[in-house]
Amino acid sequence: DRITPHMLRLGFISGDLQDFVSASPDDHIKLFLPTADASPDAKPCLRDFTPRRVDTEGGSLAIDFALHDAGPATQWAASARLGDTLEIGGPRGSTVVPDDFDWYVLIGDETALPAIGRRVEELRAGVPVATFVISAPGEKQTFETTAAWSPHWIARTGEADDASLLRAALADYVLPPGDGFIWIAAESSVARSLRSYLIDERGHPRQWSKAAGYWKRGEADAHEKIGD
């Protein structure tokens, strides 16, 4: 299904998925993507993705692909047809954020939308959750949730590794009272900058945050945990 002009959702079915465990919305799985090398010793191209929806009883898995470049994942997803197969591994481990905070703030770009969407949908009824997502125009999504969701969509006007628009949107946002959790995922330098701003300048407790670089300019298949 084409969720937005640049976001494609593909469904996978396998009996092996009945044993698939994904305890956290930002889990990572490895996709073993084919390459142009047809030799017997050719190795697949590995890429990290988020399990968007999992149905272990039905043996199905949904993965969202951000069609943002001509990389191997985009090429495979854009040309995938019913009956095509793909090897998937993981997730190897989960960092579970408790669903007992007073509020949540989720920040990211297109690459973070699968994890953001899943978390918004899985949060308990009534809990406030604000999302700040920067993307190309026309990439807004809607999520089915019983949480008190407040979406903030920021239209990108510059480079994808520019943190200024997200920071400006956050500067106008008053963090709610009580104990809250902030989650950030974007280009590595953006995620690091926003985490520093929210902790060092806004005073949010360091231990109640999680930040990651889901990609890094100039590097293929980059993923970086950001913290002390």
Language-model segments: residues:
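Extended, composition-driven regions rather than compact fold-specific motifs
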Residues: 1-228
